[in-house]
């Protein structure tokens, strides 16, 4: 029997909370996206994240954890071999990526591939060299990501096939190539994405609302802008408070991230980090820490368990619904 009628999963894209044990293998040493932002800025105006337990989970600067947090919180390790957006999101919904996606950083894409692409689309390709994706072109609000189709079925497919709503906000639809999505909303910014989520919260549906807020990553993490990142977290917190007020008693809110992107670290790439897991419902009997988990996939498995849906064959993860 389901515990929650609607589940909102909000991905604060790149808000990692400290280096994983294997982070050095990915070229990341002593990385900590949220911790280093707090260290540099000392304080952030984030009352809602604070009362949910974010600072109990990971504190720094002059910030203080909540005396009585109202959320259930822990950190999740990434089981997959990677630190990119698709790998992180796919793992949340049950897919473990063993082999990292191939990149073409040394010599660009093969000439024959570019020639075929130009032939098919009738346009010339520019760039084709290793460069920061936030520097070589202007990031516009209408930017569109072209991702690979997931390598297997996910929790999203299972939910949709069971007749449940799977509503995506932001680039979630792109990340999953529309697989398992019943309705998609594209966002012009992370603030807009939260406004869309608040609007969705006021409507009736049964199932999942899956949200990606990309500005943390695209505008501030990749560009190594600590202040911008911190201010983006503060903007999010304001809308988080509005959303929390509108949640129904049988709603569940989950906040998490897909990887790190430490704005104090060298280069412009993502960083291999633990991510937060913060769950909240008005029907919860108190908050506090729960056991650390070794995969992001507990998210998808927990959602499926809540709705009595079987996870697709070949997926990973286990439910922690009883902890929530």
Regions picked out by a protein language model, each given a short descriptive name:
Residues 1-324:
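Feature captures the catalytic ectodomains and active-site-proximal regions of enzymes
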